């Protein structure tokens, strides 16, 4: 009989190490630890070791590292030919780090596929806003004039981007945000976007299943590369979303 296993209970010290990601449970897949806090130090430590928080209102903080891991190659986001035709005719523009709080608010109001409510609690929103103010969390925003119609946010360490959530205020807004993020990162030599857990929508956009061991190897390599934190706004500027049709996206 297989011994019953429980996730590790984290202490209150933000500097306390996580257990190895390989120690995560298989049922539920990837649950590694419970407790702790969402301080910037603990969050950055988690991501740098292939671990992320995911829990609902009323639950303790749950930390995960599933196997396999969903990722996007930054040159592998798929936009359909039909969508590209629509995009060529659009007047949407794309920016970075100019509306982070609006993006995370909109993501919190948009449940993940298969879920009735949001997993982005008020506590989580404040934690990622704090990371953004420190230059570690970033958003890509899609605008129709002055109106936000799509976005994605996540955490950057070294040359690894850990996607957290995205939303569409209008059809296709999240696709444009993801494609813009991927194109920008690919141009800067960043190979992967962490997409965390599998769902059909991500697969339709080109996400791949990566064995956890391979994912952790990539994380270890990429987070060790020097990439100073800070706002992406000036570096990214503002671009016409239609220009994504001319990138190397498949």
Swiss-Prot record:
Residues 1-21 are annotated as: Disordered. Its EC number is 2.3.2.6. Belongs to the L/F-transferase family. It catalyses: N-terminal L-lysyl-[protein] + L-leucyl-tRNA(Leu) = N-terminal L-leucyl-L-lysyl-[protein] + tRNA(Leu) + H(+); N-terminal L-arginyl-[protein] + L-leucyl-tRNA(Leu) = N-terminal L-leucyl-L-arginyl-[protein] + tRNA(Leu) + H(+); L-phenylalanyl-tRNA(Phe) + an N-terminal L-alpha-aminoacyl-[protein] = an N-terminal L-phenylalanyl-L-alpha-aminoacyl-[protein] + tRNA(Phe). Functions in the N-end rule pathway of protein degradation where it conjugates Leu, Phe and, less efficiently, Met from aminoacyl-tRNAs to the N-termini of proteins containing an N-terminal arginine or lysine. One of its GO terms (cellular component) is cytoplasm. Keywords: Acyltransferase, Cytoplasm, Transferase. It is an enzyme of class 2 (transferase). It comes from Xanthomonas euvesicatoria pv. vesicatoria (strain 85-10). This is Leucyl/phenylalanyl-tRNA--protein transferase. It is found in: Cytoplasm.
């Amino acid at each position: 009989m297989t011994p019953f296993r429980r996730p590790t209970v984290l202490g209150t010290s933000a500097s306390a190490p996580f257990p190895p990601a390989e120690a995560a449970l298989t049922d539920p897949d990837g649950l590694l630890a419970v407790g702790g806090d969402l301080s910037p130090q603990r969050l950055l430590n988690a991501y740098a070791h292939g671990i992320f928080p995911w829990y609902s209102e009323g639950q303790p903080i749950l930390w995960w590292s599933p196997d396999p891991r969903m990722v996007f190659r930054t040159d592998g986001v798929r936009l359909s030919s039909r969508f590209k035709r629509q995009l060529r005719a659009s007047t949407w523009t794309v920016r970075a780090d100019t509306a982070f709080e609006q993006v995370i608010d909109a993501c919190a109001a948009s449940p993940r596929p298969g879920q009735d409510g949001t997993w982005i609690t008020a506590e989580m929103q404040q934690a990622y806003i704090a990371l953004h103010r420190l230059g570690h969390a970033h958003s890509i925003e899609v605008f129709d004039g002055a109106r936000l119609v799509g976005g994605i946010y996540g955490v950057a360490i070294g040359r690894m981007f850990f996607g957290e959530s995205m939303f569409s205020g209008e059809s296709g807004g999240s696709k444009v945000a993801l494609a813009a993020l991927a194109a920008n990162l690919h141009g800067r030599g960043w190979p992967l976007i962490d997409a965390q857990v599998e769902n059909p929508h991500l697969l339709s956009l080109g996400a791949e299943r990566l064995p956890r061991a391979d994912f952790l190897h990539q994380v270890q390599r990429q987070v060790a590369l020097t990439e100073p934190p800070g706002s992406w706004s000036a570096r990214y500027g503002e671009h016409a979303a239609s220009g994504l049709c001319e990138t190397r996206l498949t």
